[in-house]
């Protein structure tokens, strides 16, 4: 929607992802640009990230703690307003009514103009990102939370008891690839910040992976 047609300029965004580092792999430069331009950007993570390790000495509780710390450091680099950890167990996420309610609560609390989230459909051409069940569940629950749950007063009326009035999100952006995309963000000048944010996830990302990403990511990023 053109700025001239909006009741108020867009200035608040919410990014809803399954795991710590999902946003950094998909839309970190967009988040960095928004923050630099004065937007309030909140990141909501659905899972605790407690399964992403091949270290036989690592425990789920310890990994969850490490990844939460890494995400907070990344958020500082990007300039995010807040990070919300919903804390669902990693790798077991399903688009339940409870997850939808928990996401809708944050939508009502932070009242974003734009929500950025994951695609709810499986991409069989993607070996990792597009086929992870937590990503699919997050996309489905986030879309349902935006519409109709966060919008409708009589859905989960207990949220009203928490002082959270309904909220209508202006736009939803789905991260993805070139095919079928209809919205592009020029992130020229923000890739270095995005790479530094990705490097904060030391338990998940090797320096070689960050270097490779730096060389191959385009400067116009799809959101």
Language-model features, listed with the residues they occupy:
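Active-site rim/loop-helix segments in enzyme catalytic domains that contact anionic ligands
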Residues: 1-111
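Single conserved hydrophobic/aromatic residue that forms the stacking wall/gate
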Residues: 214-223
């Amino acid at each position: 929607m053109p700025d001239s047609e909006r009741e108020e300029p867009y200035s608040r965004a919410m990014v809803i992802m399954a795991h710590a580092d999902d946003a950094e792999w998909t839309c970190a430069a967009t988040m960095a640009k928004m923050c630099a331009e004065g937007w309030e950007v909140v990141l909501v993570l659905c899972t605790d990230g407690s399964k992403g390790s091949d270290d036989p000495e690592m425990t789920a509780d310890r990994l969850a703690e490490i990844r939460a710390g890494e995400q907070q450091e990344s958020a500082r680099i990007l300039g995010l307003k807040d990070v919300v950890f919903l804390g669902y167990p990693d790798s077991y996420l399903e688009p339940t009514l409870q997850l939808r309610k928990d996401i809708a609560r944050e939508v009502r609390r932070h009242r974003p103009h734009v929500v950025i989230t994951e695609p709810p459909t499986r991409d069989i051409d993607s070996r990792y990102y597009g086929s992870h069940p937590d990503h699919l569940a997050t996309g489905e629950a986030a879309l349902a939370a935006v519409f109709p749950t966060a919008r409708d007063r009589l859905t989960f009326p207990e949220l009203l008891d928490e002082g959270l009035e309904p909220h209508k999100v202006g736009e939803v952006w789905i991260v993805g690839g070139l095919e079928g995309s209809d919205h592009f963000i020029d992130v020229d000048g923000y890739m270095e910040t995005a790479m530094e944010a990705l490097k904060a996830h030391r338990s998940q990302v090797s320096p070689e992976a960050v270097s490779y990403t730096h060389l191959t990511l385009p400067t116009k990023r799809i959101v």
